[in-house]
Amino acid sequence: MNIPSIENCDLHNKTVLLRVDFNVPIKDGEIRDVTRILRALPTIQYLVNASAKIIIISHFGRPKARDNNLSLKNVIDTLSQLLNKKVKFIDDCFGEKVQRAVSVMDAGDIILLENLRFYKEEEQSDSNFAKQLASLADIYVNDAFSCSHRAHASISRITEFLPSYAGFCLQDELKYLEKAVSFKAKPITAIVGGAKISTKIKVLMKLTEKVNYLVLGGAIANNFLSFSKVNIGKSFFQNGVDDLLHNILETANKNNCKIVVPEDVLVAVNSDYSTSISRRTESILDGDIILDIGPQTLSTISSIIASSKTLLWNGPIGVFEHSAFASGTIGVMKIVSDLTHKGKLTSIIGGGDSLSAISAAGLADKDFTYVSTGGGAFLDWLSGDEMPGVAALQKRLD
């Protein structure tokens, strides 16, 4: 894909507005997974070495208003430690305080501004908001693939006001995902988990046209089981999607894509998540809540993956946050990792809670061919949808 790269830009003594994705999971004030911060470091370091002045912007969570728990101040210490360099935090995105801080920056200095989503104008793609951000800098760099499916002020609108380039994380994501969706190395298996089928209908339809096996987990699998007249007890599923399910099954059948749903499951009884009970799907009781795949399904999926050349994975198979229901997700993760290390499988993982699931399995990015930081962005890419952030950069070449 042809997009302007920061490597083709004179950065010396220029002020660069760098859009990253620091939307990291935090619990009790502690960052639980630094993957997204780590992915931004090569671009930040490159800008420092090029003697640029760097203003970092990001969103964090979905705040309704200003909220200290969702302030980017929470990531400043971790960012400074990882860079081995002091990063200054400003609790605003524009105004006199920000302008004053920017005006005294030296080459190589780094400032982190406050959460963009503290301002409703960000998600509204407000032109004036984008213009105010742009007024701080000489150059804009997008290094947030995971946000590039959003038509937000700091993602697409801002490119109207500044020379705009792609950072290394964004470039890497596009390179690997382009390779993944070329669908050349077959057989291809796709695993799709998660809660709502309506948010994944386009990607499911696309995958049934391209892959040999479509393995379903999470609440999405519950929908297919229920559609097949299997009792799913009190398990979560989405109402009013039977027509969508019918279309997916019909498309899969037409394209010789085998859809794989659980044949056995691990259930909780009466919302007790501390203990799991294994049941065949035909033996699920009214009070059961399906929270993971069972051992026979894990074995079936393992065999399918072992026969595949390419694997695309979006979303966990079970509720892996509870140890009693982590064996499915972690088991499949380890099989995929093992085959990847042996050079037998190209594995592309992204979206859902994939990053957290990889950590839960005691694995890391290096254990797979590529791990995407994108959730919705990963899905949009697989669906073939235009991504506003990427399209905006491409327009700069026209």
Curated annotation (Swiss-Prot):
Its main location: cytoplasm. The keyword Cytoplasm applies. Substrate binds at residues 21-23, 36, 59-62, 117, 150. Its EC number is 2.7.2.3. The keyword ATP-binding applies. It comes from the Bacteria. Belongs to the phosphoglycerate kinase family. This is Phosphoglycerate kinase. The lineage of its organism: Bacteria, Pseudomonadati, Pseudomonadota, Alphaproteobacteria, Rickettsiales.
